[in-house]
Amino acid sequence: WWSDACGLCVGTRVVPERTEEFRIRSLIHFVVGGPMTCGDKVARMAPQQFRYYTINMPVTGHAARPLDLFDRELPEVYHFPKERTGFGHDLLTLLNLTDEPRDYELRLSDLGIDGASLAFEFWTKDMATIEDGALKVALPPLTGRHYALHQDRGTPLVVGTDFHLSMGAVEISNTQWNPEARTLSGTISRPDKESGHIYLWIPEGFDPHLARATGARIRSSDSVLALEVEASSDPVPWQVDLLP
């Protein structure tokens, strides 16, 4: 698979019709896991374009495992097992680099994930609750999707962020669920000041509309709770109280 993704090039301007292309370029760098170089004139980049760099920084040092290496001329399914990365969750990247739609069906048990599971997608913020053990994804041509995979233990948990493609593994720490106080808390840190969101799964038995946040602002109150936070190089604490 790719051992050197070369320089990341996404241009300096926002080009909506090329959004999926830019996403794929950024994901290719992430699945490599190694050093990245900037292929654009950074000083002239729109913030939206520069973000394709920042979501890869810092690099993780972990390359994904291509699950279909011997099935296709160019692999499309990449897995980061948490047992190898040391992350608290698995990551799965799908890259449809063809001119035809693709339907994917992945048995999570083949990835070492058993029982009820959750799959949170980085770009679209879609959440899939998986009861039958299969993640089913339909991708249009030339499209990439990137999932954080979690076991559903029936308690609130961090399912992702929009700060980094590891979705919490490099930027979130000290996460704790206190069942007596009904609070979920943690800290977030980034190389520099940065605004973004932490996404929390709120299972049945908890009312997300009654949630109260400290150190963050609640931007949506569905089963996936979006917390807007201001991160910095110093760890920033956050907490969500789920009132009875």
Regions found by a protein language model. Give the residues of each.
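Short beta-strand/loop motifs in extracellular/secreted proteins, especially
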Residues: R102-Y104, G115-S117, E194-I198, F206-H209, ...
